[in-house]
Amino acid sequence: MNQLYRDLIVKHYHNPSNKGLIKNNELINYCVMKEKNISCSDEIILQVKFENKNIVDIKYEVKGCAILIASASLMSICLKKNDLILAIKKIKHFCNMLKNEIFDPQLLDDELLVFETIKDFPGRFKCASIPWKLLLQMINIQ
């Protein structure tokens, strides 16, 4: 699992999916929020397009560690095209997994399960969870 974890993190760190912000004049129907981890200076700007209680698009820009970048990349893949109710469930179960709390692995895409090792590194919880928690905030204001 450790090698799989490293390989997946490195893959998404070097080639993150859905990375890059949409220009301001093209941001019609997008919600935009920013979050910063004050303990390590990681930060993310998240742009999400919502339509008819669905996540239509996710774009982001990240300054931070490999775990944050990989987490944002996988989140953008796994939650794009989800309805909001399912997205909320996935976010909560992903964060529970990171904290070594009860979660349903069948709700999460297989690649996300490599983040289960974060429970052994509590200092990395915020790195992995920032994009997910920010998206949950965005959903809650819809």
What label would you give each PLM region?
Residues 1-142:
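Domain-level signature for proteins that mediate thiol-based redox and metal-cofactor handling
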